[in-house]
Amino acid sequence: MGLYRVRVSTGSSFYAGSQNQVQLWLVGQHGEAALGWCLRPARGKETEFSVDVSEYLGPLLFVKLRKRHLLQDDAWFCNWISVQGPGANGDEFRFPCYRWVEGDRILSLPEGTARTVVDDPQGLFKKHREEELAERRKLYRWGNWKDGLILNIASTGIHDLPVDERFLEDKRIDFEASLAKGLADLAVKDSLNVLMSWNSLDSFNRIFWCGQSKLAERVRDSWKEDALFGYQFLNGTNPMLLRHSVELPARLKFPPGMEELQAQLEKELQGGTLFEADFSLLDGIKANVILCSQQYLAVPLVMLKLQPDGKLLPMVIQLQLPHEGSPLPPLFLPTDPPMVWLLAKCWVRSSDFQLHELHSHLLRGHLMAEVIAVATMRCLPSIHPIFKLLIPHFRYTMEINVRARNGLVSDLGIFDQVVSTGGGGHVELLRRAAALLTYSSFCPPDDLADRGLLGVESSFYAQDALRLWEVISRYVEGIVSLHYKTDESVKEDLELQAWCREFTEIGLLGAQDRGFPVSLQSKEQLCHFVTMCIFTCTGQHSSNHLGQLDWYSWVPNAPCTMRLPPPTTKDATLETVMATLPNFHQASLQMSITWQLGRCQPTMVALGQHEEEYFSGPGPKAVLTKFREELAALDKDIEVRNAKLALPYEYLRPSRVENSVAI
């Protein structure tokens, strides 16, 4: 009984407000009060009013709301509702929403304090949890884009996605406008090319967008250098392939006359300075046919040596696997004629483009984040602490992935049009890679140890990934410790166990034999798993996404396709190189897509800087504040280090890491 002060916050994106009336109910532990039709929410505004309630409500548990429309359903994006009372000295309760309110159904918002099932011994929220999850399981259904791939949200297009997973209007307008600009520029360049020759490496300057990236200009000017070629395996846009060699690869067969090379490799191996990048995943992948023209793939192996100054230099390149009964494939060396060596490196860079975009970026970044998101939406209610912890890291992931499946890797999509693995090879490559995913490879401390990169001082990716993982891990531990006091409390959380099982057994098609857990038996195991989820959706994706504009704008450094077969002799000329690299249209389309996906996103939210407040109470806020302080300190450390580097490494700098897979 008494006076309650109610505040209602509406989102600031276009069309977030509504002309429809909204009715509220306050639901307490001892009673319920209808407040009537009390507001028409305005975009970007907080609406405040007071209401006298005659019933005794007790501690507030829910706010219920319903929108009424006469002629047109005008959706409303509600941020949160705050209720303070009874009286001026009454407690304040916060009810997070952060979703669209549509139609005229009643929506129940639980008070923002996170609760596991164990935290609700009276069962005050039991019915709500069950009903919410039942509804979500109907809304968030598993789909299977291609047989043999990890699962995705069941959606044929953006319009049948759950409404809360779609781009807000400002994001949609920016994304579609940038796409239109890129395609318009492509059309202009294509029309101009009719009158111009395409016969030298300088011709690629005609489609290079100056002023977009200083590093891209540096790549254009220095891409032929062996040091820059090797640097990309350490700190480029795909740092996931390089391994420290523990023996010479079995596939590395030495033709007669190569004894000196073998001795040099053995010497580097014994000294612990030999590294390798093996592209065997491409073996047997069918190459694309574009406009009746056959494209080609290689299966390179690169052996590199780490110098005392930290430079990683290539020693030998093998472009094909040896096959019994066939001549040994040639080994290309830095001492070969310049065009021969350059063409071999171009083949490696094109192969890296394929594995990066499909394996490291799409599969390990986008699709893995989607599995985490769908499993979470199906298994954890909005009141659960792990749901509240993870939900900011799913923003826009499902829509950007649907757009990728319908535009980039779809039939007649970008890959089919200009990429050598298109036309079906890209799907087979994804299947192969998905079957090899391991839990440890998503956890930098384990992955970097396995690949032997922990002690490589010039691997800034390794250094920054470890530090960012540790910061995220402490953040997760802070939240988990507020809600799980013992290992037993983790085991007893049936929602948590169902979530873990759904992720591994269903979303990943039964990946427990590759280390992914099907249950969580301790606080430590829970923290490690949740840290993996957040790092995958943030740092890991950013490390494979942010470098695209820098390293792929100069097309010869990362050719999307190759138009002649890999060389079997050492007689390449400039004409051979130009006939092998992408033609004008292919290069222009690569540049346009690279710009659209790699440009600075105006709606970008940096790691940990989300405005949504899903938790209530001082404990979680203190943990988030400490997380932000640690991110800022790491950001500053990286800034100071980068000031001393000829090539600054920015891709895991917290201020540049996006809070979710949103592009």
From Swiss-Prot:
EC number(s) per entry: 1.13.11.31, 1.13.11.33, 1.13.11.-, 1.13.11.12
Record key words, sorted: Calcium, Cell membrane, Cytoplasm, Dioxygenase, Fatty acid metabolism, Iron, Lipid droplet, Lipid metabolism, Lipid-binding, Membrane, Metal-binding, Oxidoreductase
Pathway annotation from the record: Lipid metabolism; hydroperoxy eicosatetraenoic acid biosynthesis
Cofactor stoichiometry and binding remark: Binds 1 Fe cation per subunit.
Phenotype for H384L: Labile enzyme with normal enzymatic activity
Catalyzed reactions per annotation: (5Z,8Z,11Z,14Z)-eicosatetraenoate + O2 = (12S)-hydroperoxy-(5Z,8Z,10E,14Z)-eicosatetraenoate; (5Z,8Z,11Z,14Z)-eicosatetraenoate + O2 = (15S)-hydroperoxy-(5Z,8Z,11Z,13E)-eicosatetraenoate; (9Z,12Z)-octadecadienoate + O2 = (13S)-hydroperoxy-(9Z,11E)-octadecadienoate; (5Z,8Z,11Z,14Z)-eicosatetraenoate + 2 O2 = (14R,15S)-dihydroperoxy-(5Z,8Z,10E,12E)-eicosatetraenoate
GO cellular component terms attached to this protein's record: cytoplasmic side of plasma membrane; cytosol; lipid droplet; membrane; plasma membrane
GO biological process, one term: regulation of inflammatory response
Signal peptide: none
Membrane topology: Peripheral membrane protein
Effect of M398L: No effect on the stereoselectivity of the oxygenation reaction
Cofactors named for this entry: Fe cation
PLAT domain location: 2-115
GO molecular function: arachidonate 12(S)-lipoxygenase activity; arachidonate 15-lipoxygenase activity; iron ion binding; linoleate 13S-lipoxygenase activity; phosphatidylinositol-4,5-bisphosphate binding
Domain notes: The PLAT domain can bind calcium ions; this promotes association with membranes.
Family indicated by similarity: Belongs to the lipoxygenase family.
Protein name: Polyunsaturated fatty acid lipoxygenase ALOX15
Native species: Sus scrofa (Pig)
Annotated gene: ALOX15
